[in-house]
């Protein structure tokens, strides 16, 4: 059996996520947008909770097409609040719409979301030395700077810890443990 990061466990959905997504550099702006929104949904919860609901989020939020999401109304959020496939936390659901509007405002100003995000790591993944999971930080100076810059651009639910989890999952930072099959 291949060695994996200890947080993965035995659930196939988690193994697949770890092996095929987590820590793999992603440069597609819309996929990065989806992930920053989903990371915001995780606040106070475990990632597996959000991962199990990801397809329901994609369906409810137009596959995270920022143009369509930005047009969602209060009535759309009311419907989302009735959707058992989502985390029914109004502020978190509204955050996705707010973040879509912030994303589009960046685009309107000529700022590409992928270039913006990757600029925090000089457009190169940071490969960390991770002998064991205990050395992995919850946030860094880089995630603090990203959080501040996103908030300045009107993004919400993008704190330092959320930004670091985003950086890990999207491959800006590789925090797979040394010896992991995905390192």
Could you describe each region identified by the protein language model?
Residues 1-183:
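HhH-family (HhH-GPD) DNA N-glycosylase catalytic core used in base-excision repair
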């Amino acid at each position: 059996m291949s060695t994996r990061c200890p947080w993965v466990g035995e659930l196939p959905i988690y193994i697949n996520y770890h092996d095929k997504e987590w820590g793999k550099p992603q440069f597609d702006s819309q996929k990065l947008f989806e992930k920053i929104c989903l990371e915001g949904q995780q606040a106070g919860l475990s990632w597996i909770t959000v991962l199990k609901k990801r397809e329901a989020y994609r369906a409810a939020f137009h596959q995270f097409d920022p143009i369509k999401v930005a047009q969602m109304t209060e009535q759309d959020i009311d419907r989302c609040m009735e959707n058992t496939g989502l985390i029914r936390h109004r502020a978190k659901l509204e955050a996705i719409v707010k973040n879509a509007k912030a994303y589009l405002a960046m685009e309107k100003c000529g700022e590409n979301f992928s270039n913006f995000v990757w600029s925090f790591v000089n457009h190169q993944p940071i490969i960390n030395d991770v002998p064991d999971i205990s050395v992995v930080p919850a946030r860094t100076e880089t995630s603090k700077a990203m959080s501040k810059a996103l908030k300045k651009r009107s993004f919400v639910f993008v704190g330092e810890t959320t930004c670091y989890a985003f950086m890990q999952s999207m491959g800006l930072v590789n925090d797979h443990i040394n010896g992991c099959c995905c390192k």
